[in-house]
Amino acid sequence: MKVKGTRRNYQHLWRWGTLLLGMLMICSATEKLWVTVYYGVPVWKEATTTLFCASDARAYDTEVHNVWATHACVPTDPNPQEVVLGNVTENFNMWKNNMVEQMQEDIISLWDQSLKPCVKLTPLCVTLNCTDLGKATNTNSSNWKEEIKGEIKNCSFNITTSIRDKIQKENALFRNLDVVPIDNASTTTNYTNYRLIHCNRSVITQACPKVSFEPIPIHYCTPAGFAILKCNNKTFNGKGPCTNVSTVQCTHGIRPIVSTQLLLNGSLAEEEVVIRSDNFTNNAKTIIVQLNESVAINCTRPNNNTRKSIYIGPGRAFHTTGRIIGDIRKAHCNISRAQWNNTLEQIVKKLREQFGNNKTIVFNQSSGGDPEIVMHSFNCRGEFFYCNTTQLFNNTWRLNHTEGTKGNDTIILPCRIKQIINMWQEVGKAMYAPPIGGQISCSSNITGLLLTRDGGTNVTNDTEVFRPGGGDMRDNWRSELYKYKVIKIEPLGIAPTKAKRRVVQREKRAVGIVGAMFLGFLGAAGSTMGAVSLTLTVQARQLLSGIVQQQNNLLRAIEAQQHLLQLTVWGIKQLQARVLAVERYLRDQQLLGIWGCSGKLICTTAVPWNASWSNKSLEDIWDNMTWMQWEREIDNYTNTIYTLLEESQNQQEKNEQELLELDKWASLWNWFSITNWLWYIKIFIMIVGGLVGLRIVFAVLSIVNRVRQGYSPLSFQTRLPVPRGPDRPDGIEEEGGERDRDRSVRLVDGFLALIWEDLRSLCLFSYRRLRDLLLIAARTVEILGHRGWEALKYWWSLLQYWIQELKNSAVSWLNATAIAVTEGTDRVIEVAQRAYRAILHIHRRIRQGLERLLL
């Protein structure tokens, strides 16, 4: 009974098992994801590109030619746009910033270009007979006389005049720093032989008369498709992550001031003093100090000079000091001691935070080198000042007290003026700055310092010695560009979605007039991918218009330079920026076109998403990640995905071509269009004409053949009755039999009748042959259909048979298994019961055995 019950229940078990297996397979199947292209996503990468300049040059003197050539820059934007990027952290490194290198190259190029048309002073590399200019009357202190003794020399020399073969003697005043003695052999006279400095190793070029070195703020701007990230952290040290980031198109106005030791007229720190270095533990690295409060420095050259010109050749004039009116006094700079001491105190506080709170900070003078390094060098109204800063850097800051920092008086820095300047940007070039007439004074603000730290074995553990440094102008530019870096906008984004490009259809490709506004749309960089994808239209609408506007501004700046013989470095950069912006836009549009996504903001594709690229779920991607995070996730696979998109689009276009070829057969109604009917009639006329022509040819050949045989028929269509055979006489006796069935022969006369008869015969022949062919085809189809149907029925019955056999076999096997299991279970239960009974009867057997023994 148990076995029969198991057999009945197993039929239901089989059905339920099959149903559960199918449900398990359905539930285990994962939904397939597909690659989707998005245009206008806020994604960027670090880049190196050509920057161009913007400047408001109209606010400055137009009488002179500014060495910075800011007239060639585009006008500054009156309403600059700055977009704060929320929830964005970006790494900056001011020590590896290509913007600094570009500015260095630009300033070098501008200096070189401004000196190209100027006079070369090679004829002045002659022997100079010089004496000290000793006019020092009406001075109140003898110290002044000693200080200025030998500062200015009156030199005579032989020079070629405007007539080349004529040499005359001229006199000129030179600064002591600009001449070097040749020999001191003469002891009987009060003059010595000198020559101009740098004559032995450099080409000296005189600055053109109307060249101005007055620094004008220059804004560096990026082309369309690029942007500048700006770090707004108030205590940012120039290296590392920045959490307060914004994006701008141009930097702030940077004054290209060439100076050493002290940074002038730069930007100030917003809170405390900030010190920056590439590596504080490496004493070879320069320390850039940014002050939070500026220190005024006022410089003066009190002498009232006049300027005269000496002709040193045809069309070449050398400008020198004519005479000095009034007292000969040293140039000097004034700094408030109280302000300077307060500044040093804040710097010391930051240095101790960096190097140790128990350190003694010592400021000392420069350790030596070129005059540009030893002294604070800068340009003041066209004159190059070299000021001794020993009084500024000559104190010790201990933990309890400070030495040499007391007082509220004014620090007076003695300065010397050089007219022959060794060009800071390259070796082998020198510049002669013509003297400026009248008294000179200029006021500047000290906004930063360049320091170096002493190292080696002579430094004690509790003392750090700092000295003024400089000389590498990159540090000057770096002090202003530390918070910027250039990025390249990547508006093309790729992400997985559930949507697939389903239908292959014909589609007109419109010109893409949408894109990613290179500033505005980056404001959504901190939002999730899902939130950004809902506003792609707004984000992508202004790219082309932004490019066009920028192109117009650049073009106007270039047109303003057409009167020049050659473009400045700014003009070249503007041309490069114009080309680069268009190239960037065309590249993105080309990729969209290759992928079949032209004119689309969201473009589905037929490329399946590979889990090896990223195995994150859709919810994690679209709800928790920003586009920047997602771009870093799949950055290594971007090129692979691009290749697959291109291959998929090529296959789709091939399928589209095949589909279009099938479209001609899909629309049968086109067969009845008037165009097709005219084509049919033309073909019919050609066929009939060909047949008639063949008929005529064969008729002529037949006539020729019969004429050669000796006779000619009465008509082309004469048909003689065919005689009956001997078994069929023409008639029957007594006129009672069947009549003769031979038809009368049609005798046709005329050419048209002949054509009609031939055409009629041809049509009848064609009709009979086509009818026979259709009957054969119909019979063949009928036979094949019947046999095919029989074969299908046979295979269906065979399939049903094998399915039934498999089912019966499975049921039999399962039934046998169930029976075996059941029988085995019964045997096990029976054995267990017997063992249990035997155990229960042990005491009875023992009792019975004892009873037998007792009996």
From Swiss-Prot:
Region entry V2, spans: 155-199
Region (V4): 387-415
Lipoprotein listed as a keyword: yes
One GO cellular component term: viral envelope
PTM comment text: Highly glycosylated by host. The high number of glycan on the protein is reffered to as 'glycan shield' because it contributes to hide protein sequence from adaptive immune system.
Taxonomy, superkingdom: Viruses
Annotated spans, MPER: 661-682
Glycosylation sites: 87, 129, 140, 154, 158, 184, 190, 200, 233, 244, 265, 279, 292, 298, 304, 334, 341, 358, 364, 388, 394, 400, 408, 445, 458, 461, 610, 615, 624, 636
UniProt-listed CDD domains: HIV-1-like_HR1-HR2 (cd09909)
Region (V3): 299-332
Residue window of motif YXXL motif: 711-714
V5: annotated span: 458-469, 460-469
Sites of S-palmitoyl cysteine lipidation: C763
Extracellular side: 32-683
Annotated family: Belongs to the HIV-1 env protein family.
Note: Inhibitors targeting HIV-1 viral envelope proteins are used as antiretroviral drugs. Attachment of virions to the cell surface via non-specific interactions and CD4 binding can be blocked by inhibitors that include cyanovirin-N, cyclotriazadisulfonamide analogs, PRO 2000, TNX 355 and PRO 542. In addition, BMS 806 can block CD4-induced conformational changes. Env interactions with the coreceptor molecules can be targeted by CCR5 antagonists including SCH-D, maraviroc (UK 427857) and aplaviroc (GW 873140), and the CXCR4 antagonist AMD 070. HIV-1 lineages are divided in three main groups, M (for Major), O (for Outlier), and N (for New, or Non-M, Non-O). The vast majority of strains found worldwide belong to the group M. Group O seems to be endemic to and largely confined to Cameroon and neighboring countries in West Central Africa, where these viruses represent a small minority of HIV-1 strains. The group N is represented by a limited number of isolates from Cameroonian persons. The group M is further subdivided in 9 clades or subtypes (A to D, F to H, J and K).
Comment on protein domains: Some of the most genetically diverse regions of the viral genome are present in Env. They are called variable regions 1 through 5 (V1 through V5). Coreceptor usage of gp120 is determined mainly by the primary structure of the third variable region (V3) in the outer domain of gp120. The sequence of V3 determines which coreceptor, CCR5 and/or CXCR4 (corresponding to R5/macrophage, X4/T cell and R5X4/T cell and macrophage tropism), is used to trigger the fusion potential of the Env complex, and hence which cells the virus can infect. Binding to CCR5 involves a region adjacent in addition to V3. The membrane proximal external region (MPER) present in gp41 is a tryptophan-rich region recognized by the antibodies 2F5, Z13, and 4E10. MPER seems to play a role in fusion.
Entry protein name: Envelope glycoprotein gp160
Source species: Human immunodeficiency virus type 1 group M subtype B (isolate ARV2/SF2)
Lineage, highest ranks first: Viruses, Riboviria, Pararnavirae, Artverviricota, Revtraviricetes
